[in-house]
Amino acid sequence: MKNEMHLEFSALSQNESFARVTVASFIAQLDPTMDELTEIKTVVSEAVTNAIIHGYEENCDGKVYISVTLEDHVVYLTIRDEGIGITDLEEARQPLFTTKPELERSGMGFTIMENFMDDVTIDSSPEMGTTIRLTKHLSKSKALCN
């Protein structure tokens, strides 16, 4: 059975935790393991933070869009902004690369996404925004609740 959720919110730093918790709550119906849930929450946090800090350069007028589709123990996430886009996607995907060193950003966001998810696709064009598509196959075993 397929189940979908769509979320739209202002590109404000304080909305990052809202996005993370909302996605985690929606995914909980598949009974993921704690590790799987933590990885997905971390990826959502990284992608949303990238949209706010880099995509909109903290311009509160922007919107962040999240779509989640659950189907047969697979989570499909799309996180999109309509910000400034990424001029050099290959460079941006390199570990430790950041365009905002003055903000003490680690430059590990895309690396974390690629390590925690089964598939990561990034589409971006300057002045057109960025769309990140992520796929995670959940284990069929049930989470243990003690």
UniProtKB/Swiss-Prot annotation:
InterPro entries registered for this protein in UniProt: Anti-sigma-factor_SerPK, Anti-sigma_F, HATPase_C_sf
Enzyme Commission identifier(s): 2.7.11.1
A Pfam family recorded for this sequence: HATPase_c_2
Keyword Transcription: no
Keywords linked to the UniProt accession: ATP-binding, Kinase, Nucleotide-binding, Serine/threonine-protein kinase, Sporulation, Transferase
A single BP term in Gene Ontology: sporulation resulting in formation of a cellular spore
Domain of life: Bacteria
Gene Ontology MF terms: ATP binding; protein serine kinase activity; protein serine/threonine kinase activity; sigma factor antagonist activity
Reaction it catalyzes: L-seryl-[protein] + ATP = O-phospho-L-seryl-[protein] + ADP + H(+); L-threonyl-[protein] + ATP = O-phospho-L-threonyl-[protein] + ADP + H(+)
Described function: Binds to sigma F and blocks its ability to form an RNA polymerase holoenzyme (E-sigma F). Phosphorylates SpoIIAA on a serine residue. This phosphorylation may enable SpoIIAA to act as an anti-anti-sigma factor that counteracts SpoIIAB and thus releases sigma F from inhibition.
Family affiliation: Belongs to the anti-sigma-factor family.
Protein name: Anti-sigma F factor
Protein species of origin: Bacillus velezensis (strain DSM 23117 / BGSC 10A6 / LMG 26770 / FZB42) (Bacillus amyloliquefaciens subsp. plantarum)
Name of the gene encoding the protein in the UniProt record: spoIIAB
